[in-house]
């Protein structure tokens, strides 16, 4: 049997700290009005494992988020893994592990008819977007699938490829010109 047990874990982080940068997790101001932990992505609902054999043939398996058994072609395979619960992420060219791409749609929710508090909008549609779906990924360029009676365990840590952003504005004057965001 040509099977491997995938054991997946996820880096559920939302902040990539630069060397010497601020450690926001240790010094998060309460005046931000939101907790540091609430910005972290949630555990995904599923895992997609794409295996590509040496001839470039692709096989996809949909598993629970922590993994499971994957059947692969014997010999060398490339593996591309990502969370299987993305609603607004578009995957392209997954038939080739080298050229696979993921992107968000240009607009992911319907426009609304303008800000009712702003007379200048005159009911004109305003382009808005939903926050991007969390996307986690892991890639293994070469994995040798052996014929063994008990599946070998392959640990994979999926890292975030899409992040949340917290944007804060602080005003010293002109607050009377600010509408509801």
Positions of PLM-derived features:
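Short, low-hydrophobicity acidic/polar segments
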Residues: 48-160
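Residue-level signal for secondary-structure boundary sites
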Residues: 14-16, 89, 175
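Extended low-complexity, serine/threonine- and proline-enriched intrinsically disordered segments
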Residues: 21-57, 176-181
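Short structural boundary motif marking the start of a folded domain
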Residues: 2-7, 45, 163-165
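Residue-level recognition of well-ordered beta-strand positions that form the cores
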Residues: 7-11, 50, 82, 168-170
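Bacterial Sec-dependent N-terminal signal peptides
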Residues: 1-17
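Short helix-loop boundary/capping segments
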Residues: 164-181
């Amino acid at each position: 049997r040509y099977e491997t047990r995938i054991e997946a874990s996820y880096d559920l982080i939302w902040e990539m700290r630069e060397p010497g940068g601020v450690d926001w997790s240790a010094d998060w101001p309460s005046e931000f009005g939101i907790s540091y932990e609430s910005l972290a992505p949630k555990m995904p609902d599923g895992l997609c494992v794409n295996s590509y054999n040496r001839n470039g043939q692709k096989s996809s398996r949909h598993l629970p988020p922590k993994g499971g058994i994957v059947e692969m072609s014997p010999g060398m395979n490339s593996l591309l893994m990502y969370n299987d619960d993305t609603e607004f992420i578009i995957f392209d060219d997954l038939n080739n592990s080298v050229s696979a791409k993921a992107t968000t749609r240009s607009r992911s929710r319907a426009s609304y008819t303008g800000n009712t508090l702003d007379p200048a909008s005159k009911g004109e549609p305003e382009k808005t977007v939903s926050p991007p779906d969390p996307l986690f990924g892991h890639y293994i360029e070469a994995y040798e699938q052996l014929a063994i009676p008990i599946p070998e365990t392959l640990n994979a840590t999926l890292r975030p490829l899409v992040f949340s952003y917290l944007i804060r504005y602080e005003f010293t004057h002109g607050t009377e010109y600010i509408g509801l965001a």
